[in-house]
Structure formats: structure tokens, C-alpha cells
Amino acid sequence: MWNALQDRDSAEVLGHRQRWLRVGTLVLALTGTFLIGFLFGWFIKPSNEATGNVSHSGMKKEFLHELKAENIKKFLYNFTRTPHLAGTQNNFELAKQIHDQWKEFGLDLVELSHYDVLLSYPNKTHPNYISIINEDGNEIFKTSLSEQPPPGYENISDVVPPYSAFSPQGTPEGDLVYVNYARTEDFFKLEREMKISCSGKIVIARYGKVFRGNMVKNAQLAGAKGMILYSDPADYFVPAVKSYPDGWNLPGGGVQRGNVLNLNGAGDPLTPGYPANEHAYRHELTNAVGLPSIPVHPIGYDDAQKLLEHMGGPAPPDSSWKGGLKVPYNVGPGFAGNFSTQKVKMHIHSYTKVTRIYNVIGTLKGALEPDRYVILGGHRDAWVFGGIDPQSGAAVVHEIVRSFGTLKKKGRRPRRTILFASWDAEEFGLLGSTEWAEEHSRLLQERGVAYINADSSIEGNYTLRVDCTPLMYSLVYNLTKELQSPDEGFEGKSLYDSWKEKSPSPEFIGMPRISKLGSGNDFEVFFQRLGIASGRARYTKNWKTNKVSSYPLYHSVYETYELVVKFYDPTFKYHLTVAQVRGAMVFELANSIVLPFDCQSYAVALKKYADTIYNISMKHPQEMKAYMISFDSLFSAVNNFTDVASKFNQRLQELDKSNPILLRIMNDQLMYLERAFIDPLGLPGRPFYRHIIYAPSSHNKYAGESFPGIYDALFDISSKVNASKAWNEVKRQISIATFTVQAAAETLREVA
């Protein structure tokens, strides 16, 4: 079990500290008047131990210079030789390899942290597929059972066939209904405007726009008895680019795997809220959290063509329902003309199993503030080879660990403790990170400074993409001004310059875009449940010209090392840039005397979010007046927060940094600010999402929503049966948000 207080290698780590403690004990025994002097010496004078007589900027320069593109390339190659599905021997072997290498790199402590969680696998003897059957029940078409292997991988075993993880077993048959992206608004269009019911039908939807788990939830609410997911060329095939292996587009037989859970931050479905260790109480499977109730299966667009080409019913309501296949995209239900007697049948035989998973946790102890933790984490498990997701991120983490280890071997420790994590079972619902955070939640809430996520390093090669708490805005802006841009046409210019020009903020003129944190990745439990300041960075595509969802080969067998080397980043300059950004964020958070958090950026963001949610509410002016809904209290709280944050920053500028007590007080105020936005009761219906300012959208887990309690209360409010009850809930959520913002402001006031 990971224990941050273990004393391995203590002679090296704490020798200097113990000498001062012995002196301090003697002094205290003589007189208490030397206590303050002792504390000053403890916090300030031993700084040479952390830096080896090298300045902060010099140490950072040395750290960044140590990061090498060729190492990241080598690590990526090594991590993508075989599949690393969670719960398999291959992934366990990779965990042990990373464990051993992190020890070689010089970390003080590296451990494997295991949990027994519910996972889902396809049945090897009864494969999953979809068929079209005639009136006699005979199959006249069936979908592919697997993808064609990419060149060079024909003899690789243990490639899991395409499936939707956690789908229940079942063989439903019936008429097909095309539901576009299966978003909430798509079902509203079908049911309210087109008067088409999905009850008792099998629905087919194209991937994109929203998280697949939300798609399945919407289908269940609409009464569907089964769901088919596919990747449409309009969303996963860029014009003028060839399909893999000749290009980076998705072949017709390529399929996106993925889980279809709706956990809402619960972690392991059998142990929601608590770590899935040997002592855990486990719910029966029938009471598990977040499992879908209808069979679900993914297919490629070649097979989707066969299912959609003879659809009957009305034409698509508008062009946004048409994809890139040569089919009419009729909605159904059922097939037309001579095919009207044919039905669709699903054959789903996947099973769930409690399986052991392994995180790798590495510790680099801080020299001066060992009880303050900065965490860098990314997952290791992959659906198949994981050339981009996750191993492009895992390779970067590996190189960052190596660089910090090199500095440590030279006697240059960080000021604060850095924890490095290789998470398992992220693809199955963020299970590895969530279970570990649940087990150590009290410690993390007390000592966690920040969490930096390190999943896929690239999803394109156009510009930087950052999602983070407003506390980190200034940190990210400042460090990107110090890094060189890898982009063509920006030689000699900073990363900030290219980022600002290619991805300008729609909210703040003259600044690069920074997005809100949603979910779908391992920062979720740290940010949404524990209130630890979080952020992530990667290189992305040009979203203005490249309209496809994510990158085309996402979660397919074709996501290989060769995909990255041939098409995305041949020189690994973008990987190196991402390593520099992630590494510099960790470095600054772990080494800055004053934590590099900016509470005034939070104040600006709160004002923007309050204005936005108010404008949404004013789409219903009559109801706002009738039910006496007012945002005055929220605006007042935001104004108070803004005033207090400004005064806090002024005190911070005047802070005597040689005073360890005052320094610790103000750093703690900064560290705990994110925690102040946490409501222990959570959001309505989503108790593990506890951040009142940010949460994943209820309608798309990938997207972040501000003031989510108010937003959800206002969503589709005109259709609520009990209008008075609905508007009272809006009033209640405004009250909760007001209290939370005001309470957060109180934490920034000068300590009496």
C-alpha cells in the first residue's frame, strides 16, 4: 500500500533535516525564545538542499533541457508492442516494467497499488455481432466479428474484438430507428416534433458530439431495447486523406471501442465512493452503479451502410442528420419496401468480472515541504495498442520522471513532494485513479496541491490545447511564453504566440483559449470530488477546418506506433513540447516559493459564468418574474469574491517571503481555495460531482459546465410538468451557488 510517510532512503532525504531537529530540540530544551528562529532556519536556510545551489530558473532550465524527444519516441515504441487491456497479464507486466524503470530513474519510492474492480470482456467462444434476419428468422447479413489487423501486427495475439464494455447480454430483435448522435436534442426532435417513438425499438447512432455513455442513457430513457453505435465517415474520415495504413483516416472496418457506463464519478460500480480493496463491501451486480440496461454494440461504417441503406420512414429532419454514407439517412422505424419484413437482431454475450488492476505510484520526496503533494498522472491501459491513447501520454510521463530523477541524483530535490502515477483501467470508467484517490482521500484533501493529467499527448499537430482551473491560467500563460513553439511559421517565437494566434480565446481578447474541465479522464476524482486544482495540456487539431470528432482512429486496432511516426509527429517535436508544458507545470507547482495560483483569474471566470447562466435564465423572463427568481445574491457574492481576491493578491505582493509562518498561511489559502468550492452533498442526482462551479455536463460527460446545478435546473424547464417545483429548484441552486462563492471568498480573507 502506498504510504507517503515511509522512511526508505531516509538517510539521503532527511539527513539535513534530522541534524537541524536535533539542534532544535536542544535549543527548545534551553529556552522557547529560539523557536521562531528555528522555524525560520527550517523553512528558509535549507533551500540549498532542494536546489543544489542552483537558482529556481536555472534548475528549471536544466530540467527542461534534460527532456529528449528521442527518449519519448523510444518509450512510445516500447509501450505499444502488445495490447495492454486493463486486467490482463500484458498490462500487469507493463506495470512491473514501469515500476522497475522509475526506481532506476531515481525516485525515492515506487509501489504497485492494486484494486479488485468490475471489468467487462467479450466472450471468446460466443462473439458479439449484429444481424439482419428475414421473416423466417434466418440471417441474411451479419456484421464483422473483428477488424483486419494493421500491417506488421498480423501475428499479435490478445487483440480484443470491438465491443461496448459493460453492455449487458441479450439478443433483442426488432425494427431499427436512426437517432443521429443520440443526443438529448436528437431524441427531442424525434419524439416531440416527428412523433416517432423509440420504445421497443433498436436504435442506431453515429459516434461523435457526446460521450457514448450519455448516448446509451438517452436511448434507455427513450425506451429502446438495444443500441448500435458506428463511426460515420462525416465524423471520422477527413476528405483528401487516405485510410490507414496509407493515411490517418478510419477504414470502413475500423471500430471504436469504449465503455458505456454512466458512473457520474462513482468509481468501481460495486464499491461506489469507497476503495475496491480486499476489505470492501461489494454490491450485488443487480445493484451496481452506472451499468446500462440495454445491449450495446459498436460497428464500422461498412457494416453500418448495410443496416442503413434500406431504412424506411421519414427523411432526416435536416442536413445535420445526414452523414457521409451513400444512404438516405431515413429515420425509420424499420426497413422500406421489399425489405419491410426484415428485422435487426443483436447478439451480445459479453460478461463482467471482478478483476485485479494495478496502479504504479512513484514518490519524489520534497526537501522543504514534504507534506505538500503535486501529482502527475496518466493511464497505461489501452483498448489495443494505444499509439495515441494513452501511450503517447505515458511515454511523456516516463520522460518527465526520468528528468526529475536525473536532477535528484545531482542532489536537486523539489521543494514539495511530487507523486507520479501510471493509472490502470481508465478506459473502464477511470477506475484506477478513482479507487486510489478514494483510498487516500483524507490525505489528499489535506495535502494535495495540484493534479496534472497526462493522457494522450497529441490528438493532432496544429496547436496547444489546455483545460484547467482558473487558478492555473497565469501559470500556463507564463510558462508557454518561455517555451519555443514547434509550429511551422513560428520559428523563434514562443509557444504562447502560436497558441494565441491559432486558438484565440472567445471570452478574453488577446489571450489563448483555455477550456473548462469536464470529465472522461483521470483528473475527475481529484477535481470534481476532492477539489484539488487540476489541469491538462496536449497538442490538438485545427477544429475550424478539421470537423471530425477526435482523431479518426480513436480506440481502434489501427492506433499504432506507426500512426504517430508516419502521420502525426515524425520528429516527436510536439510530444516534446507537451512534455515541456506538463513538466514545467509540475516543476513550478513543486518548486515555487509562493504557489503559482492566481485567485483573481478565478474571480474573472466567476463573473463570466454568472453572466452566462443569468442570460440563459432570461430566456424565460415571464417565469423569472412570476416565480420571483433573482440572481442578485449570486452577483453580490461574485463581487465580494472579486474584492477579496484583489486584496489577497495585494497582500501576496507585499508578503515577506522570509517569514515561513506567513508564507505557509498564504500558500495554504491558495491551495485550499479549490476545496472551498466543494459541496459535500454533491449535485442533484450526482453525489460524487461536488464542485459547485464546474461539473461534467449532464448531457455530455466530456464537456465541462459552469454553475452546473443552476444549469441543470434550467435545462428544458419549459417542458416540466410541475413548473412551480422546477422553478423552486432553480431558486435553490442559486442559493447553493451564492453560499459557496461567498464561503470561498471568506477563505481568502486576511487571517486574524
From Swiss-Prot:
GO MF, one example: metallocarboxypeptidase activity
Cystines in this chain: none
Enzyme nomenclature, EC number: 3.4.17.21
Family matches, as SUPFAM superfamilies: PA domain (SSF52025), Transferrin receptor-like dimerisation domain (SSF47672), Zn-dependent exopeptidases (SSF53187)
Modified residues (Phosphoserine): 10
Topological domains annotated Extracellular: 45-752
Catalytic activity: Release of an unsubstituted, C-terminal glutamyl residue, typically from Ac-Asp-Glu or folylpoly-gamma-glutamates
Function: Has both folate hydrolase and N-acetylated-alpha-linked-acidic dipeptidase (NAALADase) activity. Has a preference for tri-alpha-glutamate peptides. In the intestine, required for the uptake of folate. In the brain, modulates excitatory neurotransmission through the hydrolysis of the neuropeptide, N-aceylaspartylglutamate (NAAG), thereby releasing glutamate.
Subunit structure: Homodimer.
Record protein name field: Glutamate carboxypeptidase 2
Species annotation: Mus musculus
Species classification: Eukaryota, Metazoa, Chordata, Craniata, Vertebrata
Gene this chain is encoded by: Folh1
